[in-house]
């Protein structure tokens, strides 16, 4: 229901996503998304990694004040309105909006890696869900204090 409401709110974006089977399929399977990503002035998304290399991520910059950039691996790129960036988010990446006040907005689209055949999407989805659980367990749970572990 929410997806249908969002398609009505953003018909041009919905049409764009509909024209990209590798993106719409991933979103419909619940392992990808198409969303507007806003980053407030002065914000920094700390270094992080996605959970899988079975997908790629596209950023289409829509509103870009001065001082907005992304680092993927060792490469830093400036955001420029209308200039598409595609990257594998399983590599460490971080984002800055160094403008003191203005918001940066990108259309973020995740889509199947082109090396994965459509016939493999269902099996890959299952593997991705398992990888996400492991990734969250490894990155979101605090490490166990050694003093709390039972003696062996």
Protein language model regions, located:
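An acidic, glycine-/histidine-flanked metal-binding catalytic module
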Residues: 110
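Ligand-binding loop in jelly-roll beta-barrel domains
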Residues: 92-107
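Fe(II)/2-oxoglutarate oxygenase catalytic core
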Residues: 1-55, 65-68, 103-105, 116-152
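A short beta-strand-loop-beta hairpin characteristic of the jelly-roll/cupin
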Residues: 62-81
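Conserved metal-binding segment of the jelly-roll/cupin
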Residues: 78-93
């Amino acid at each position: 229901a929410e997806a249908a409401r969002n398609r009505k709110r953003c018909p041009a974006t919905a049409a764009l996503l509909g024209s990209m089977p590798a993106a719409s399929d991933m979103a419909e399977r619940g392992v990808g998304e198409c969303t507007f990503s806003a980053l407030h002035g002065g914000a920094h998304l700390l270094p992080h990694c996605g959970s899988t290399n079975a997908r790629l991520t596209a950023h289409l910059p829509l509103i870009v004040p001065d001082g907005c950039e992304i680092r993927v691996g060792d490469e830093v790129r400036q955001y420029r309105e209308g200039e598409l960036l595609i990257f594998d988010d399983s590599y460490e990446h971080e984002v800055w909006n160094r403008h003191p006040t203005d918001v940066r907005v990108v259309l973020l689209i995740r889509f199947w890696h082109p090396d994965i055949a459509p016939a493999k999407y269902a099996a890959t989805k299952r593997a991705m869900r398992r990888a996400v659980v492991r990734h969250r367990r490894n990155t979101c749970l605090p490490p166990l204090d050694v003093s709390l572990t039972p003696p062996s």
